Amino acid sequence: MYGDLANKLILEAKRTQQLNQRRVNEDLQSGGGVNLLSRLPIYHDELVRNILNEVDQLRRNAEFLRNNGNAEEFAHLDEKIVKCQYFVTLLCMERNKRCLLAYQKLRTDILDNIAWCNNGTGIELYSGSNEDETNSLSHYEQEYLKEYGELITELKSESMADIDLSGSLEPPSDVFIDVRVLKDAGEIQTEYGVFNLIKDSQFFVRQSDVERLIQQGYLQKI
C-alpha cells in the first residue's frame, strides 16, 4: 500500500531520536560530556530509493488522472470520484516527500552536532578506526560532514579565532571542578600549569580549560 514504506522510515527516525535523547541524558548524568560519536544507525539507502520510486509512480498516476480525467475510460465514473483519486494521489506523494525530508533533517542535525562538538573535525573523529561507524553514513552524508567541518574550521581560524564558537551556551555552575581521566590524553598547558592526563588520575582544574576534553570523552566531571 502506498505510504507504508514512508511510515517505516519515520518509525526508524523516531527510534533514532529517542535513542539519541536517552544517550544524551546518560552522558550528562555521568558527567562525561555528550558523546556524539556512533550516534547514527546505518543509512537506509534501499528504503529511501524505494520511496523515491514510489513517489515517481504516484507522480505518473497523478499526471495520468489530470490529463485523462475526461477520457472515455473514465466516462462511467462520477467526476467527483476522479477528482478524489487525483487528490488522494497527490496527498500520498506529498506525504512521502515530507517523510523523506524529516528523515534527512534528523540525520543532518546529528551530523551538525558532531561537527560542532568536535571543532570541525567531525568526519575524522566519527570514522575513527571503526569502519562500521563510517559505513553507517551514506556517501553524501560523509561528504556533507567533511565539508561542513571544513566550514567550521575556516570560520574559527579567521576573524573569530579568539571566540570559542563551539563552546557550551550554558554558563558553568562552578569555575573549578574535580575531574577524572578516562583515557590517556598526554600533557595539557593551562594558565595554572601543566597537567599530565593519565588514565584514572584526578585533578582540580578550571572548567573552561578542560571543557573540550570532557565533551570528547577524555575526562569525567566528578
From Swiss-Prot:
The UniProt subunit note reads as follows: Component of the GINS complex which is a heterotetramer of SLD5, PSF1, PSF2 and PSF3.
Q: What is this protein called?
A: DNA replication complex GINS protein PSF1
What's one GO BP annotation on this UniProt entry? DNA strand elongation involved in mitotic DNA replication
GO cellular component terms, semicolon-separated: CMG complex; GINS complex; nuclear replication fork
Compartment(s): Nucleus
Domain of life the protein comes from: Eukaryota
What are the alphabetically sorted keywords of the record? Answer: DNA replication, Nucleus
